[in-house]
């Protein structure tokens, strides 16, 4: 049994830990969606966290805990700076603005070759991420977000998502709560970037582009944003699909786009929708009734 597990872990450890880091990414965009914002900058925030921590551990010998903290603070600060002008937008305009920001980040990474390695990326990043780092991060983020959902802030997020104008008339600081959701989501995406960078040894600008942004959104929309379980389920499915369908690996971006369209059309509340699941179970029971 021990030998089997050792063999399994040596082959699939990166995949298993990627389930955790992708869950963090899905939860990061869940925060902004739960406040009614379609912001697509999470891949860029992941990249900022990954590059910040990698440069600090490789070039300056920072310890892993302090590099994690820096990798979370840096994207949160950037989110605060860009959030002031962009969060005045909504819907597709906000999505376009944040996508443009992601492209700016990618181009900055390409230009700063002496620091980031440019198109070649950073290689030889210390492998400091352990399985318990990922597990602890996912559990802690889930715990904090669960507390947030039940708090006054969480109720304010929900009110803003339902009707921003009405929320403002009720005395809710709409801009302040949007900024909070945006910055917290950026910090969580940065955490995922730190853990992923110190797991895979290598990061490059292509990992944090448009395709990755769509993938993160697909994870969350697929699982559903009515609960914290949904984004995690979506992250697991999107992470495992390429392994199950290796022969279609070249069409991964197409598959993500197709899944996103189908979910929006036929399951707008995602797979983890208790009402839909109850109906599905009810139909199953009727089908087996003699």
Q: Where in the sequence are the language-model features?
A:
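Transmembrane alpha-helices and adjacent helix-loop boundaries
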Residues: 1-290
């Amino acid at each position: 049994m021990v030998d089997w597990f050792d063999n399994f872990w040596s082959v699939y450890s990166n995949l298993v830990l990627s389930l955790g880091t992708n869950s963090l990414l899905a939860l990061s965009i869940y925060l902004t969606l739960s406040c009614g914002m379609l912001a697509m900058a999470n891949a860029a925030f992941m990249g900022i966290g990954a590059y910040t921590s990698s440069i600090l551990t490789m070039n300056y010998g920072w310890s892993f805990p302090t590099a994690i903290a820096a990798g979370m603070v840096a994207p949160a600060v950037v989110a605060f700076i860009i959030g002031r002008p962009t969060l005045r937008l909504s819907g597709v305009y906000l999505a376009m603005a944040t996508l443009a920001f992601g492209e700016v980040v990618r181009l900055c990474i390409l230009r700063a070759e002496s620091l980031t390695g440019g198109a070649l990326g950073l290689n030889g990043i210390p492998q400091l991420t352990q399985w318990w780092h990922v597990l602890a991060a996912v559990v802690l983020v889930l715990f904090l977000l669960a507390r947030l959902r039940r708090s006054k802030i969480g109720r304010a997020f929900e009110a803003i998502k339902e009707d921003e104008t009405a929320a403002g008339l009720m005395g809710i600081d709409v801009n302040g709560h949007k900024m909070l959701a945006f910055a917290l989501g950026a910090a969580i995406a940065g955490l995922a970037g730190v853990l992923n960078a110190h797991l895979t040894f290598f990061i490059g600008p292509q990992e944090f582009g448009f395709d990755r942004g769509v993938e993160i959104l697909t994870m969350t929309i697929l699982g559903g944003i009515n609960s914290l379980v949904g984004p995690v389920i979506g992250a697991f499915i999107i992470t495992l699909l390429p392994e199950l369908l290796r022969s279609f690996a070249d069409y991964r971006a197409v598959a993500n786009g197709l899944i996103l369209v189908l979910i929006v059309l036929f399951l707008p509340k995602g797979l983890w929708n208790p009402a839909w699941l109850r109906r599905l179970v009810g139909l199953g029971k009727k089908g087996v009734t003699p």
